[in-house]
Amino acid sequence: RASKEAAQLLLSRVYLYMQDWHNAALTAEELLKEDTRLYHMSARDSARIFLSEDNTEVLFSQGSMNFYNGMTGNRGDFAVSDSLVQLYDQENDYRRYFFGKNQSTSANSLQWKYDTIAVPHVSDIYTLRIAEGYLNLAEAYAMEDNFQGANQYLRLLRESRIRNYVHTTYTGEKLVEEIRLERRRELCFEGHRWFDLRRYAVCEKYPYSKQIRHAFNVYDGNKYEWDHTDIYVLEKNDPAYVMQIPKSVLEYDEEQMPENPRNKRSPLGDDE
């Protein structure tokens, strides 16, 4: 069951999403007074995957591994975007070893952050771990212009992830940018990215939005062969960054609230 520390971490995340930087910092501080156990990746066992039941960073995990192997029956085979792979120091960042290559084509990097195919015990759907507390506190401090505190917790996390890490001190928007990049590196495939992108877009102090391109492979159901790929684009600040209201809620509402807008879109052509 969830511990006090797990509840504190989740609460600090909620305050972060609310842009309540003061309470996000207070809650993360309380958590890290209780538990500061970052897993130093220099001591990692190459025979073990990072997120396992032996990882001391994990505070709470719940749910199955359906995202892990439910679609293909294989081990952790979600393709990793090139932009994410390139964020890591290719020589010194231990997290780079989260990603392997497709054994048949070597074309795509695949995520290998979770356990092997032999009955994993840490969920890739819902996990709370200490590293997020460091990032939550660093971000809250940076938003309150406590640059010294923000740099301290960013440095502590990076020292446990990067060989021979030498910290550069950041301030202002550049510091927030570095923390956001570190959050993407550290928490990839743990269910954070979509929520982070949406809250960045409405951040009052340092707003950020980006274009997202998604590829959908279409298969021939009769031959079980790939047919073609459709590319869809979500533009910066697109209304679709906000989910539509469920039909059941709209039908129940007596005031007939308006549906959230959603632009119609078609896949890009081959020349786009």
Q: What positions do the PLM features span?
A:
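Expand to "…catalyze enediolate/carbanion chemistry for C-C bond making/breaking, isomerization
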Residues: T169
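Structured, solvent-exposed acidic/aromatic patches
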Residues: R1-A131, M143-G149, Y153, G172-K174, ...
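Alpha-helical junction/boundary sensor with strong preference for TPR arrays
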Residues: E34-T36, R161-N164, R183
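Active-site-proximal region of nucleotide-activated glycan assembly enzymes
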Residues: A138
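A contiguous binding-surface segment within folded domains or other stable secondary-structure elements
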Residues: G149, R155, E159, R163
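Long, intrinsically disordered, low-complexity segments
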Residues: G172-E272
